[in-house]
């Protein structure tokens, strides 16, 4: 069954939204990661050829204490890339809204409930953190590499084409980034805007061709997580780096932003540095 068919049958995407009035964990819609990975010719009977996570920031998160007083926080959810499923975004939004009128003893009780529900849906332990005070919010992050967007290019390809990628014989270690990433929701067609950062060691990637490849996603319809995995696999296969990390930070929609990270390095650390567009 295709990802689109699963979503059309089960998701609230593209439908009139009815917001829950009480805690409703069954709203969460898990989507098998294998559905997309098969299209990338990834052997789904083995562990994926990368490590990483999907980091979600939730900006519209609230609940009641036992006296009925509302509390608010920013939520941070870290779902391992090795989990069997991802969570469909609108179902996640509705699930979080189901906490709005629910009473809890404290923030820890809320986060523990969310951790239990999410971990059950994706079949792996999910990390849940709450940012409760302004002093905990990180400052905007600027990548330390080369910005590709300053390059003057001509392009008329707006669907992913890995054949655009090319390398030279020189071996380098460098970080490249772009704010021109755009793809689209595969169900609603809504645009997904983001920034992408690529760090690698290997044959030097032609910068102009890499920018063209990034822009080629402009009319592509695929989820955030799937786009980043497609980036990773295309660069890995066509450019053959010894080390590779690809991460994207998408702008928010419906009070959520999604930030997938994929790497050949198994000893990565989770970094939640918000971009200036977030």
UniProtKB/Swiss-Prot annotation:
Its EC number is 1.7.1.13. It is an enzyme of class 1 (oxidoreductase). NADPH binds at residues 89-90, 253-254. GO terms for biological process: queuosine biosynthetic process; tRNA modification. Its main location: cytoplasm. The active site is at residues 185, 192. Pathway: tRNA modification; tRNA-queuosine biosynthesis. Residues 261-278 have a biased composition (Polar residues). Substrate binds at residues 87-89, 224-225. GO terms for cellular component: cytoplasm. InterPro entries: GTP-CH-I_C/QueF, NADPH_dep_7-cyano-7-deazaG_red, QueF, QueF_N, QueF_type2. Residues 255-278 are annotated as: Disordered. Keywords: Cytoplasm, NADP, Oxidoreductase, Queuosine biosynthesis. It catalyses: 7-aminomethyl-7-carbaguanine + 2 NADP(+) = 7-cyano-7-deazaguanine + 2 NADPH + 3 H(+). It holds the Pfam family QueF. Homodimer. Belongs to the GTP cyclohydrolase I family. QueF type 2 subfamily. This is NADPH-dependent 7-cyano-7-deazaguanine reductase.
